[in-house]
């Protein structure tokens, strides 16, 4: 239920793995190519953390449907990833 709530709000949020070495950032993706722009997808950016006090190195990003992003979010939580805000000022 928490997953559905977070994704319904469509806000930007960051997950970090157990080793604190990798992050994924989920944020709403607005398709401006359509006549009436709407948010029906999520951009998932991923990167590495080399030092906790430094800016993470973002390796890439991709756009997924909201449903696919929900599945990935749930899978990451099941693997032990945690929601974090420590890199919010860098991203």
Residue ranges and their predicted role:
Residues 1-75, 79, 84-91:
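Terminus-proximal functional modules
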């Amino acid at each position: 239920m928490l997953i559905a709530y977070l994704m319904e709000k469509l806000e930007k949020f960051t997950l970090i793995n157990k080793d604190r070495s990798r992050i994924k950032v989920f944020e709403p993706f607005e398709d401006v190519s359509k006549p009436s722009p709407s948010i029906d997808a999520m951009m998932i950016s991923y990167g590495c953390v080399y030092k906790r006090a430094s800016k993470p190195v973002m390796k890439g990003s991709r756009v997924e449907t909201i449903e696919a992003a929900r599945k990935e979010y749930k899978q990451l939580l099941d693997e032990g990833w945690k929601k974090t805000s420590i890199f919010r000022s860098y991203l």
